[in-house]
Amino acid sequence: MNHKQITTLWCRVIVEELIRQGAGFFCISPGSRSTPLTLAVAANPNARFRMFPDERSAGFYALGYARAAGKPAVLVCTSGTAVANYFPAVVEASADAQPMLVLSADRPFELLDAGANQTIRQQDIFGSYTRWNLELPEPGTGTPLASLLSTVGQAVKRSLGSPAGPVHLNLPFREPLEPESHDLAHPWVEPLRNWLASEQPWCRFEQPRTAPDANALTALQQILANAERPLFVAGSMDKADDAEAVASLADSLGILLFADLTSGLRLTNKCTPWQLAFQNETFATSFKPDVVIHFGGALIGKQPAMTLRKEPPFHYVVVRNHPGRFNPDHNVTLSIEASPAAVVSALSECRKPAEMGGFAALFSEVAHTIDTAACAPDEPVNEISAPRIVSSLTDGKHALFVANSMPARDMDLYAAPVSEKPLRVELNRGVSGIDGIISTAAGFSAGLDKPTTLLIGDISFLHDLNALSLLDNPTNPLIVIVLNNNGGGIFSFLPIASQTDRLDECFATPQNFSIESAARTFDLDYASPASNREFTELYADALKRNKSLVIEIRSNRQANLLLHRTLKAKLDPIFEKAGIFGN
């Protein structure tokens, strides 16, 4: 076999084994050095792939796909800065335990550190953010193909491990790079005879299941049995079964449940939306749980943690299926690595159910106040009404993706809890960046195979503008709702707003670009409703169509700040007179 044939077979073996291991979706960015990999994907009838001119966008698309599908997409790129552009998405995937596979093509050894064009040190470029990284040898008959197959299997296994995360394989290729048909009868290929005749992976990997430690469960049962004022917290959870189990236990035992937006429970009508109550000082002062059991990961809002810092509970227990430390306030007294559902099943009989009524009327008044103050039909659509309307109209046939900063906070605070079942809501909360959001949402929609709505701010929108080119899928359209307050609106809510006269110049960074022109550039439909009624009708109609759409909601940062403060002033007396936990 000549060099071209060896390289062609080498790459086709890699691609085939990836597909057999369940990693059959490829996000490819065009490049010369990655030619053998790209054409190996294109030649495989079982491979699904999409081309991305921008590697940074491709990385976030792969991240979104993994969030939805629960398995890694495979990123393929050429050498040089191409692979470096994956870095932000790799960091997010690592921080939030999302599987990802990176196959980077590289120059051969003699071109490294020799002044050769488009050549950098790519091995271990992502450092500690990968679960595994490996430099493969150059294609050659001296390397057994069986070792190549087992390496591919190991890469997929590590990506899906506990915790899941990115895996990087760096593949050097020597020119010529063009493919050439090869002979499978070659002695080098003979050990793969059975593999070639089957459709099975070279090696099957069973991911370990983490069962709750018996001693830890006994301790937790005792803690909950003796608790006088227990609180359940539902943080970010990937599996609906976990979320439903936690909600069911809280309901059956009569225990207050704080359900974060990322838990999937926040938008259900079975959970009380406590977020706004935690912003009230009277509530925060009187709320003193002695035991907190935190299921899942982090929360969007700071208020619960701030409240608990003032009156630390006697026990703070964390239950999540992740070996990493989750203890930002360093107050955790017991940490259990297991699925929340597995732990919940052991807690149902540990205490008698308690009465926890009287909240329906309170939160009905809260909802009425929000709707009157911010959501009146003929009033301008705003940054409070938009997430509330979206949450009230979206059903199980549609998914939600929410950008960080104000959209995440406002959806968490003001969403209408009307869904019968947990509604799939995703955010990039690993490191909570504002970059790559449109790309992630597009990948999430593709991985979920479901239409999706994205709620995003104007700065995040502009940050990932080229990703609008990805919204051409009629099967899974993306409705992009841009909350345009002409800059970084969140800074108006931070202490710096009152401590500098350079807020706009150094923090808010106003922009006057046309969202409409951006949408038209990418041949996307565009609308800009003025009132809540117009937005409600427009969004309800968009949910019925199989076409992507950009909806711009124009607002003003100062008006938005005033609206939030005015609404809080109207809600505070409601919580204060209720005396929920008054002693």
From Swiss-Prot:
EC class (word): transferase
Pfam families registered for this protein in UniProt: TPP_enzyme_C, TPP_enzyme_M_2, TPP_enzyme_N
Pathway this chain belongs to: Quinol/quinone metabolism; 1,4-dihydroxy-2-naphthoate biosynthesis; 1,4-dihydroxy-2-naphthoate from chorismate: step 2/7; Quinol/quinone metabolism; menaquinone biosynthesis
Key word Nucleotide-binding present: no
Record's catalysed reaction(s): isochorismate + 2-oxoglutarate + H(+) = 5-enolpyruvoyl-6-hydroxy-2-succinyl-cyclohex-3-ene-1-carboxylate + CO2
Biological function: Catalyzes the thiamine diphosphate-dependent decarboxylation of 2-oxoglutarate and the subsequent addition of the resulting succinic semialdehyde-thiamine pyrophosphate anion to isochorismate to yield 2-succinyl-5-enolpyruvyl-6-hydroxy-3-cyclohexene-1-carboxylate (SEPHCHC).
Encoding gene per record: menD
EC number(s) recorded for this UniProt protein: 2.2.1.9
Keywords in alphabetical order: Magnesium, Manganese, Menaquinone biosynthesis, Metal-binding, Thiamine pyrophosphate, Transferase
NCBIfam families: menD (TIGR00173)
The UniProt record lists the keyword Transferase: yes
Full protein name: 2-succinyl-5-enolpyruvyl-6-hydroxy-3-cyclohexene-1-carboxylate synthase
Provenance organism: Chlorobaculum parvum (strain DSM 263 / NCIMB 8327) (Chlorobium vibrioforme subsp. thiosulfatophilum)
Similarity remark: Belongs to the TPP enzyme family. MenD subfamily.
Cofactor note: Binds 1 thiamine pyrophosphate per subunit.
Cofactor(s) this protein requires: Mg(2+); Mn(2+); thiamine diphosphate
Quaternary structure note: Homodimer.
GO biological process, any: menaquinone biosynthetic process
Molecular function as annotated in GO: 2-succinyl-5-enolpyruvyl-6-hydroxy-3-cyclohexene-1-carboxylic-acid synthase activity; magnesium ion binding; manganese ion binding; thiamine pyrophosphate binding
